[in-house]
Amino acid sequence: MSQFLSLRNCLRLTIRLLRQFRRGEGMKAVIIMGSKSDLDYSKKIASKLADFGIDAVMRIASAHKTPEKVLEIIKEYEKEDVVFVTVAGRSNALSGFVDANTSKPVIASPPYSDKFGGADIFSSIRMPSGVAPMLVLEAENAALAVAKIFALKDEGVREKVVQFQENKRREIYKADEELR
């Protein structure tokens, strides 16, 4: 009888793992903005993610003003296959705060600002020990970074990443030919 239960538990585990790793199931990027002023930049990320076949959810919460809201959002998605993308200008506490409170990948993608000569980027670079959000500038590159993470598990996403890279190479060759 104990062998039967053990076999049954193994089958349940196998079925659960197969469901979990089914192509594309549950994979999404959760874009957390520090404020509504980050919405246009976040929409660019979401648009590029759609090109890779990746769903995006956009949320607004501030590590400075509403840290409890940030924690609620993290908890809401903690059991899913997600990559968090944090978008916060000025003083970017959001990226480190999210990373310190999740085991999921966090990509910090602060929008560029001419104010302060772009120096606000430094708040995204230096993090305390044990806090490691990945810094990726530009909306398209942030989406590509998310896609590469999901490509580890999803062949369809991997193929789209490879095609994207090939298209970028073709653009260079074409630009060179046009100059000749």
From Swiss-Prot:
Substrate binds at S35, D38, S62, K65, G89, S91. SUPFAM superfamilies: N5-CAIR mutase (phosphoribosylaminoimidazole carboxylase, PurE). InterPro entries: PurE_classII, PurE_dom, PurE_prokaryotes. The keyword Ligase does not apply. Coiled coil: none annotated. Its EC number is 4.1.1.21. Pathway: Purine metabolism; IMP biosynthesis via de novo pathway; 5-amino-1-(5-phospho-D-ribosyl)imidazole-4-carboxylate from 5-amino-1-(5-phospho-D-ribosyl)imidazole (carboxylase route): step 1/1. It holds the Pfam family AIRC. The keyword Lyase applies. One of its GO terms (biological process) is 'de novo' IMP biosynthetic process. One of its GO terms (molecular function) is phosphoribosylaminoimidazole carboxylase activity. It catalyses: 5-amino-1-(5-phospho-D-ribosyl)imidazole-4-carboxylate + H(+) = 5-amino-1-(5-phospho-beta-D-ribosyl)imidazole + CO2. Belongs to the AIR carboxylase family. Class II subfamily. Catalyzes the reversible conversion of 5-aminoimidazole ribonucleotide (AIR) and CO(2) to 4-carboxy-5-aminoimidazole ribonucleotide (CAIR). This is Phosphoribosylaminoimidazole carboxylase. It comes from Archaeoglobus fulgidus (strain ATCC 49558 / DSM 4304 / JCM 9628 / NBRC 100126 / VC-16). The gene is purE.
